Amino acid sequence: MLKASLLFFVTALAEIIGCFLPYLWLRKGASMWLLLPAAASLALFVWLLTLHPAASGRVYAAYGGVYVATALIWLRVVDDVKLSLFDWVGAAVALVGMLIIVAGWRVN
C-alpha cells in the first residue's frame, strides 16, 4: 500500500506541475515556453497512472484521495496559504477513502 501511495503522490505532483506551469503563463505573465515542460509533465502524469495494477476506474478513484492531499500541500508550500482545519479534515477523509479502495485491490 505504501508503494501505491508514493506512486500516487508522484503522479499528483506531475499533474499539478503540468497544470501550474500554464497557469503561470496565462495568469502571471510567465513565458509561453513553460508550456513545453507542462506538456512533458502531463505526459508523465498519464504514464504514471498506467503503472498501477488495478482497473483504471479504481486507480482514478483512489488517486483522487492522494491528489486532494497533495494539492493542499502545494497550497501551503507553493502558494504560501495557511491550511484550515477543514483542509486537514478533508484531506484525511480523502486519504481514508483512498486506503479503503486500495485495500480492496487485494480482495479482487
UniProtKB/Swiss-Prot annotation:
Location comes to: Cell inner membrane
Q: Which UniProt keywords apply?
A: Cell inner membrane, Cell membrane, Membrane, Transmembrane, Transmembrane helix
Q: How does it sit in the membrane?
A: Multi-pass membrane protein
Transmembrane ranges, per UniProt, are 6-26, 29-49, 59-79, 85-105
Q: What is its main location?
A: membrane
Q: One Pfam family, short name please? A: UPF0060
Q: Which SUPFAM superfamilies match?
A: Multidrug resistance efflux transporter EmrE (SSF103481)
Q: Which GO terms describe its cellular component?
A: plasma membrane
Could you tell me which HAMAP family the record lists for this protein? UPF0060
| NCBIfam families cross-referenced by the UniProt entry | PRK02237.1
Regarding protein family, the annotation reads: Belongs to the UPF0060 family.
Q: Give the protein's recorded name.
A: UPF0060 membrane protein YE2027
Origin organism lineage: Bacteria, Pseudomonadati, Pseudomonadota, Gammaproteobacteria, Enterobacterales
